[in-house]
């Protein structure tokens, strides 16, 4: 995460500052330790060099910084200054696929490295790991055949065929085997009364079952999956007396009996352990008088039964972890809900182990195995074997998106074919007695490994030319070595010219750094002008004036330098992975990694191996709890968009695998999976409603159940729209006509009423119609004068 980069820069500056303090502080550490030999000089600090040139001026210190020695005219070929280095001895390229010749498959590179380290120095080297595609897989199914698993036995009778069908999608080279266990066939674990119960433990239940057995190997790993089905069908259950089973005995024998089981060297090894009960552990055998500790060896007899079941105790978790690691076996606990928390605790102590919740009848075991294999293949975790006590290692992981995560030696959320790298710093404390040693770094469950050969460069080349009884050392009172005299016992001085028996008080002023200060810091005797430091039960006193020791550093919780460093003249020199004045602050970050793959859940900073939550409202060991933070629906929505629909900000930033570690399963509809389930709904960019459920089971496995088809609004029906438009136009036209007719009618009625009103008010005079003409007309002749 980008928020960690300032922390990395600060750590780098602190380291550089510490180194600078050694060189340019108030005093030069190389000249203040009072060393008088080349070997002692190299042990003071990685920055110190020794000059064996006899022509070096007498007042010039031979143990000094290299640049100072050159200034003092020391010839370059006479300067002893070994430099720590790393050399790659073998580095085969990483393979891309696992098919073909398995001997040529390489998942770890380089394979061999040689380190040369001088005292208290360190060197960084790199390691790359790739989960190759189509890698061979061996699956050994180890089943509890106690009476309570009777229904489970019938459920797995066709498991071989189904498992092969599913696993063929992941590998073309699969082999499967079968074994069974109950418990030690001895009282008090078995029924011994009535006598018939010995041969038939189900006698009191009016039923028949097999005599009790510890562990039996049934089917050697084979690619003939039908044989698995046939052998399972032949099996019958037995019955034990107490609740815990003897499963750890079976795990141990299935792990160490390579030839019987048929584990291949070049394959992934999966040991599937199924049970519905607790299991006995080391020292439980004493209940039956069995006191002989488990020896971690194969004891399967000719009858394929565990022959030491009644004579050897159950194995311890530590022994089991050691053997599983040696044989590169990944253990899968497929257990029922009632004991899942117990086996979850076991898995935290056994690297490379996963836990799945088994249904009461084992009907889900197929999906459980496939999911567990996917989880195993999605993680790379380094383990270290045979590390010398004087060496300490610190890791930085580069997982996805080339992001460096300090203090981490594992990567999760990977896909098959992904390549991850680790930067490893090896630091030596002091100078080990055994000058050449080796150790191994390997990913858990991988056969491939990196072998690191270490040579501790504690000696000087000039020591090979030492001259015992040299005349230069006062006529043979010492050995002339690397330009100085190494005096024999009883002689002191630069040329071994002074006998310890010659005591002159006038020389005591040379044993005090300043006038008035104690002689030899009151921790030594001044002989011949030199301090001979006292021996101490607490440690070693050194220095020109006996001013230094390796036991006067600060203590934290009762341990010097917190038990994570060495005391060097009052200062703690911390081991790798530790820092601070007390060396009480770890630089590892794996303890801060949350289940979602983020440091402190992305809500805090990792300081000294603990999360300091900075987002308001967040709390928990990894800041995983935050009631006021955006809820799970808001956080998981981006993962659904990325993994299901291949879009969203996580997809654009290529961070899908990094932030989304949950399994996604597509369903037709959401069901009630219990109180640990959260139903979520959101509307996507297409305006569709997406429904999903976030569920985390008791084993810690998180699943996103996503409804396959989002609920999107339906598109418009063209015919309906067309008819609707036409109908609307027709209705509008009819409405317009009706309104127009109504208005006309209203208007006519108003006019008629007005006419009637005016007619009623009108008053007419009687007169002839001026237009009316009678039918006859009378004319008078004005010229007629008759009578």
From Swiss-Prot:
Explain the post-translational modification: Phosphorylated on tyrosine residues in response to thrombin-induced platelet aggregation. Probably involved in outside-in signaling.
The topology of this chain with respect to the membrane is: Single-pass type I membrane protein
Which residues, if any, are the signal sequence?
A: 1-25
Q: Where is this region: CX3CL1-binding?
A: 202-209, 292-312
The entry's Mg(2+)-binding residues are 146, 148, 245
Q: Which GO terms describe its cellular component?
A: alpha9-beta1 integrin-ADAM8 complex; alphav-beta3 integrin-HMGB1 complex; alphav-beta3 integrin-IGF-1-IGF1R complex; alphav-beta3 integrin-PKCalpha complex; apical plasma membrane; cell surface; cell-cell junction; external side of plasma membrane
Q: Which residues are glycosylated?
A: 345, 396, 477, 584, 679
Enumerate the Pfam families for this protein. Answer: EGF_2, EGF_integrin, I-EGF_1, Integrin_b_cyt, Integrin_B_tail, Integrin_beta, PSI_integrin
Residues in domain I-EGF? 462-497, 498-547, 548-584, 585-624
Residue intervals on the Extracellular side: 27-717
Give the Phosphothreonine positions (modified residues): 766, 778
Domain VWFA: residue ranges: 134-376
User: Which sites bind Ca(2+) 1?
Assistant: 148, 151-152, 276
Per UniProt, the keywords (alphabetical) are: Calcium, Cell adhesion, Cell junction, Cell membrane, Cell projection, Disulfide bond, EGF-like domain, Glycoprotein, Integrin, Magnesium, Membrane, Metal-binding, Phosphoprotein, Postsynaptic cell membrane, Repeat, Signal, Synapse, Transmembrane, Transmembrane helix
User: Mind listing the GO biological process terms from this record?
Assistant: apolipoprotein A-I-mediated signaling pathway; apoptotic cell clearance; blood coagulation, fibrin clot formation; cell adhesion; cell adhesion mediated by integrin; cell migration; cell-matrix adhesion; cell-substrate adhesion
Under InterPro entries, the record lists: EGF_extracell, I-EGF_1, Integrin_beta_N, Integrin_bsu, Integrin_bsu_cyt_dom, Integrin_bsu_tail, Integrin_bsu_tail_dom_sf, Integrin_bsu_VWA
What sequence ranges are listed for the domain PSI?
29-75
The record's GO molecular-function terms, alphabetically, read:
C-X3-C chemokine binding; cell adhesion molecule binding; enzyme binding; extracellular matrix binding; fibroblast growth factor binding; fibronectin binding; identical protein binding; insulin-like growth factor I binding
Which positions, given as ranges, span the membrane? 718-738
Q: What does this protein do?
A: Integrin alpha-V/beta-3 (ITGAV:ITGB3) is a receptor for cytotactin, fibronectin, laminin, matrix metalloproteinase-2, osteopontin, osteomodulin, prothrombin, thrombospondin, vitronectin and von Willebrand factor. Integrin alpha-IIB/beta-3 (ITGA2B:ITGB3) is a receptor for fibronectin, fibrinogen, plasminogen, prothrombin, thrombospondin and vitronectin. Integrins alpha-IIB/beta-3 and alpha-V/beta-3 recognize the sequence R-G-D in a wide array of ligands. Integrin alpha-IIB/beta-3 recognizes the sequence H-H-L-G-G-G-A-K-Q-A-G-D-V in fibrinogen gamma chain.
**What's the name of the protein?**
Integrin beta-3
Q: Which organism is it from?
A: Rattus norvegicus
From the broadest rank down, the organism's phylogenetic lineage runs: Eukaryota, Metazoa, Chordata, Craniata, Vertebrata
Please state the gene responsible for encoding this protein.
Itgb3
């Amino acid at each position: 995460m980008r928020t960690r980069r300032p922390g990395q820069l600060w750590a780098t500056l602190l380291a550089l500052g510490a180194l600078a303090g050694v060189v340019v502080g108030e005093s030069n550490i190389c000249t203040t330790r009072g060393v008088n030999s080349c070997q002692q000089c190299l042990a003071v600090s990685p920055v110190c060099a020794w000059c064996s040139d006899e022509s070096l001026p007498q007042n010039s210190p031979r143990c000094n910084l290299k640049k100072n020695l050159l200034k003092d005219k020391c010839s370059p070929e006479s300067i002893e200054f070994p430099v720590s280095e790393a050399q790659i001895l073998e580095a085969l390229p990483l393979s891309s696929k696992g098919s073909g010749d398995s001997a040529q498959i390489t998942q770890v590179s380089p394979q061999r490295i040689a380190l040369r380290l001088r005292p208290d120095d360190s060197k960084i080297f790199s390691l790359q790991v790739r989960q190759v595609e189509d890698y061979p897989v061996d699956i050994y199914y180890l089943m509890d055949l106690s009476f309570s698993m009777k229904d489970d036995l019938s459920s797995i009778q066709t498991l071989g065929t189904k498992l092969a069908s599913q696993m063929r999608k992941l590998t073309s080279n699969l082999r499967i085997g079968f074994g069974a266990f109950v418990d030690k066939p001895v009282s008090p674990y078995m029924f011994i009364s009535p006598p018939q119960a010995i041969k038939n433990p189900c006698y009191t239940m009016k039923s028949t079952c097999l005599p009790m057995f510890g562990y039996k190997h049934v089917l050697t790993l084979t690619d003939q999956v039908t044989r698995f089905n046939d052998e399972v069908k032949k099996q019958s259950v037995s019955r034990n007396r107490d609740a815990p089973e003897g499963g750890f005995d079976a795990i141990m024998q299935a792990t160490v009996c390579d030839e019987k089981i048929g584990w291949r060297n070049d394959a992934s090894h999966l040991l599937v352990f199924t049970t519905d009960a607790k299991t006995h552990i080391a020292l439980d055998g004493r209940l039956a008088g069995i006191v002989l500790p488990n020896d971690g060896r194969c004891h399967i007899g000719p009858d394929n039964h565990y022959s030491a079941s009644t004579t050897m105790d159950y194995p311890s978790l530590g022994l089991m972890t050691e053997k599983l690691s040696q044989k590169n076996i990944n253990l899968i606990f497929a257990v029922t809900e009632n004991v899942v928390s117990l086996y979850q605790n076991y898995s935290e102590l056994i690297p490379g182990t996963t836990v799945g919740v088994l249904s009461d009848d084992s009907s889900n075991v197929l999906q459980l195995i496939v999911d567990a294999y996917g989880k195993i293949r999605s993680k790379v975790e380094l383990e270290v074997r045979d590390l010398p006590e004087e060496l300490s290692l610190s890791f930085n992981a580069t997982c996805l998106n080339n992001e460096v995560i300090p203090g981490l030696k594992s990567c999760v959320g990977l896909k098959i074919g992904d390549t991850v790298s680790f930067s490893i710093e090896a630091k030596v404390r002091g100078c080990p007695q055994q000058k050449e040693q080796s150790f191994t770094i390997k990913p858990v469950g991988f056969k491939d490994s990196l072998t690191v050969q270490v040579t501790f460069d504690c000696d000087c080349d000039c020591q090979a030319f030492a001259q015992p009884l040299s005349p230069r050392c006062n006529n043979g009172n010492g050995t002339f070595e690397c330009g100085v005299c190494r005096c024999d016992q009883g002689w002191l001085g630069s040329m071994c010219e002074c006998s310890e028996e010659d005591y002159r008080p006038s020389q005591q002023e040379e044993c005090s750094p300043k006038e008035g200060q104690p002689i030899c810091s009151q921790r030594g005797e001044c002989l011949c002008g030199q301090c001979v430091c006292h021996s101490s039960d607490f440690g070693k006193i050194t220095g020109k004036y006996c001013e230094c020791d390796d036991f006067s550093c600060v203590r934290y919780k009762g341990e010097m330098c917190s038990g994570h460093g060495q005391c060097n003249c009052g200062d703690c020199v911390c081991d790798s992975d530790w820092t601070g004045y007390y060396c009480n602050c770890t630089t590892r970050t794996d303890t801060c990694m949350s289940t979602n793959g983020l440091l402190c859940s992305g809500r805090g900073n990792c300081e000294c191996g603990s999360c300091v939550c900075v987002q308001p409202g967040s709390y928990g060991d990894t800041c995983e709890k935050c009631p006021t933070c955006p809820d799970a629906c808001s956080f998981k929505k981006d993962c659904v968009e990325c993994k299901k629909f291949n879009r969203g900000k996580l997809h654009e930033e290529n961070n899908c695998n990094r932030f989304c570690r949950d399994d996604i399963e597509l369903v037709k509809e959401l069901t009630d999976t219990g109180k640990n389930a959260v139903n979520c709904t959101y509307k996507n960019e297409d305006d569709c409603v997406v429904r999903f459920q976030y569920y985390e089971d008791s084993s810690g496995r998180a699943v996103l159940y996503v409804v396959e088809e989002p609920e999107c609004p339906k598109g418009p029906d063209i015919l309906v729209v067309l008819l609707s438009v036409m109908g609307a136009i027709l209705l509008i036209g009819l409405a317009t006509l009706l309104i127009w007719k109504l208005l006309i009618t209203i208007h006519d009625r108003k006019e008629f009423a007005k006419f009637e009103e005016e007619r009623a008010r009108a008053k007419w005079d009687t007169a002839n119609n001026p237009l009316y003409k009678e039918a006859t007309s009378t004319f008078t002749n004005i010229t007629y004068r008759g009578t």
